[in-house]
Amino acid sequence: MRKVIYILSLSIVALMFSANIIHAQCGADAQANACISKLQDGFTFLKTFKVDGQGGAKAKVEYSYVFSKDTQYYLNICNDGADTDGIVVTMYDSKRQVVSTNYNKGKFYAGMIYPCNATGIYYITFTFEGSQNYCGGSVLGFKR
């Protein structure tokens, strides 16, 4: 009986350890870098963003960036799964008012363009709506 309990305990520990390894293998760096080539024509690359929801343990990933007035910004999303895999991108101005999102009426869009009309700090949040992988990458580009 002790052997059975011991083997069962070891199996549970091994399962928990392997689950943690799976979460750690998001590959957000590679996905963000792969996103660069998918930047829309006419936009100049600015920055990549890693989107690692740690297998669902993290509900939100947030970044900030200074945007300039009279500049258009393009933000795209990439991942290994289908389309955006439930990654919702929401952009907020310095007053935390929503100015743009890639999710509208139940549909996810792989990219969004934001025409900036006020220079300031903008917040870019990535959340997960029915995501399978909780992992992806994103690229920010601009044009004047």
Where are these regions (language model features)?
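A general sequence property marking short-to-moderate contiguous segments
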Residues: T44-K50
